[in-house]
Amino acid sequence: MKPLVIKLGGVLLDTPAAMENLFTALANYQQNFDRPLVIVHGGGCIVDELMQRLHLPVQKKNGLRVTPSDHIEIITGALAGIANKTLVAQAAKFHLNPVGLCLADGNLTYATQLDPELGHVATVVPKNPALLNNLLGEAFLPIISSIAVDKQGLLMNVNADQAATAIAALIQADLVMLSDVDGVLDANKQRLPELNGAQIEQLIKDNVITDGMVVKVNAALDAAKMLNQGVDIANWKYPEKLTALFAGEIIGTRIKP
């Protein structure tokens, strides 16, 4: 089976019961299926909490966190440290053989600064799959934070959706984006199992897809186009459905290129 990349949204990291449910589902899945799994995560809520504790301002531009050079060490500590090791600890509890990584380890990706006004924020492209392939071949569970390093050796913060897309492209994997939404809903609040780019454009125009959902759907559409395959948006709140999702069933909305 193709590997599966699971992108985890930040709110999950703030919800211990949800994390427990997720890793229970992953453990059940791995007992019954022989499919390599990779987790890619952000952790915006953990970054925000840490910044608040340190009385540092949180500034965003077009939905992306502005990361000046005096903040990148704190953000790296939050994402590659607290968030990553929290997930590794949960996975270890369920005997899932986790290995905590960032996007720079083993030259997995190549990072380029996105916009000088955003500071230490980058986009990444796939580079070298050897480390991941070796880990997956030995039945490890890689858990990858969205911290990268550019060619100058500078730490960079990467949007977790974009990071997950690059990792999925790197190892030719399927991609599932887990967050706190059931998928895309129509005007009658009914879940839409599948959508393509033209349908998404129309739903945004009709104000059916609004606010934060626009960002989620566009990220999934970008990923679907780059990977040339469907990308699922699904909710982590239903542990009983997650095993089916990991096996390829649609429980949320599949965004098609």
Swiss-Prot record:
UniProt keyword Transferase, yes or no: yes
Q: Any idea of its EC number?
A: 2.7.2.8
Point out the annotated site residues (description: Transition state stabilizer).
Answer: K7, K216
The membrane spanning regions, by residue number, are: none
Q: Which GO terms describe its cellular component?
A: cytoplasm
Could you tell me the superkingdom of the organism this chain comes from? Bacteria
> Where does this polypeptide localize?
Cytoplasm
Under catalytic activity, the entry for this protein gives: N-acetyl-L-glutamate + ATP = N-acetyl-L-glutamyl 5-phosphate + ADP
Q: Which GO terms describe its biological process?
A: arginine biosynthetic process via ornithine; L-arginine biosynthetic process
Primary location group? cytoplasm
Q: What class of enzyme is it?
A: transferase
UniProt GO molecular function? acetylglutamate kinase activity; ATP binding
Listed A to Z, the keywords are: Amino-acid biosynthesis, Arginine biosynthesis, ATP-binding, Cytoplasm, Kinase, Nucleotide-binding, Transferase
Which InterPro entries does this UniProt record tie to the protein?
AceGlu_kinase-like_sf, AcgluKinase_fam, ArgB, Asp/Glu/Uridylate_kinase
Pathway assignment = Amino-acid biosynthesis; L-arginine biosynthesis; N(2)-acetyl-L-ornithine from L-glutamate: step 2/4
The family assignment reads: Belongs to the acetylglutamate kinase family. ArgB subfamily.
What does this gene product do? Catalyzes the ATP-dependent phosphorylation of N-acetyl-L-glutamate.
For this entry, the protein name equals: Acetylglutamate kinase
Organism for this UniProt entry: Pasteurella multocida (strain Pm70)
